[in-house]
A protein has these predicted regions:
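A detector of repeated loop/turn-to-beta-strand junctions in beta-rich toroidal repeat architectures
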Residues: 7-13, 66-73, 123-130, 183-195, ...
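Loop/turn-rich, solvent-exposed surfaces of beta-rich toroidal or solenoidal domains
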Residues: 160-163, 171-174, 196, 202-238
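Structural signature of WD-repeat beta-propeller blades
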Residues: 30, 37, 75, 87, ...
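Conserved core positions of repeat-based scaffolds
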Residues: 38-41, 50, 95-98, 107, ...
Length: 281
């Protein structure tokens, strides 16, 4: 939980992260990303703190097996060098991410299905122990665009850029990447069931940029600037909002931009359910 390495239950909220500095230097928590059993916290100073379970390296720092309890209290994570400051953090079930002030994207944790986006050549790449740059998503590689949001599912990840583009990597067995079966990302892959480097996801209306994404365990959803809502992936429990469909491989419209009575404002995917925030037009 981040405040004790011996307590098993806490029934009332308590303060977790103490950020003390010299007088006048105020550091606060800016955002929090949660995985299956770990947390990633970004502060207003651009620092990253992680805590929780670290067996899959999702904490981004070394935790000795005989001292696993040390992972349950907050400690800083370094992105290459201490000079780099983070601007965004994200997490999947057992993997984590950060974007630094230069626009580089970093991933770490479980990578057995390529979900960190750092590449996969052999079983040695199944776990990324320390933050490693994600392939193809630096500010230079995106021609000045930059990643502003990252969300992950059990074994997959979505990256959203400032210009409204979405990239995906990881497991694709249930269509959770939003990539068609003939997408070039599947060519020459070590395993046809996953994509180890971020690939661009196409949407029905390319003129309506994406402003928010969310990942469930095996499904995804996205909201556009114009108020449309898309979903894709596994739908065996109705989590796609598309009726009785078990799988959708590419983004499909749930709420239209034009016509209809509702405007999609936000979406959040859970394990096997999805919640949307809508406004009357």
């Amino acid at each position: 939980m981040g405040f004790s390495n011996g307590l098993k239950h806490q029934y009332k909220p308590v303060s977790i992260l103490e950020l003390s500095h010299k007088q006048g230097d105020i550091e606060k928590v800016a955002s929090i990303a949660s995985g299956g059993n770990h947390l990633v916290v970004l502060t207003t100073h651009g620092s990253i703190y992680t805590w929780g379970a670290g067996e899959q390296a999702q904490l981004g720092r070394r935790v000795l097996e005989r001292r696993k309890i040390h992972g349950t209290v907050p400690e800083k994570v370094t992105l290459g060098t201490r000079a780099r400051k983070a601007t965004t953090v994200g997490a999947g079930a057992f993997h984590s991410f950060a974007v630094d002030d230069k626009g580089d994207v970093w991933g770490w944790g479980l990578n057995s299905m390529g979900q960190t986006g750092t590449g996969y050549q052999s079983s040695e790449d199944s776990v990324v122990q320390l933050p490693k740059k994600v392939k193809g998503l630096s500010k230079e590689e995106l021609n000045g665009d930059r990643v502003v949001q990252i969300d992950g599912g059990t074994h997959h990840t979505l990256f959203l850029t400032a210009n409204g583009s979405v990239y995906a990597c990881g497991r694709s067995n249930a269509g959770q990447l939003g990539l068609s079966e003939d997408h070039e990302a599947f060519k020459d892959q070590v395993d046809p069931d996953f994509v180890a480097e971020p690939a661009l996801v196409s949407f029905p209306d390319p003129e309506d940029p994406i402003i928010q994404v969310s990942c469930g365990s095996h499904n995804c959803a996205a909201v556009t600037e114009g108020g449309a809502l898309y979903s894709w992936g596994q739908g065996v429990q109705g989590e796609l909002g598309l009726g009785d469909v078990e799988e959708v491989r590419t983004p499909r419209v749930v709420v239209r931009k034009d016509g209809g009575a509702w405007f999609a404002a936000a979406v959040s995917c859970g394990g096997q359910h999805t919640v949307g925030l809508f406004r009357k037009k």
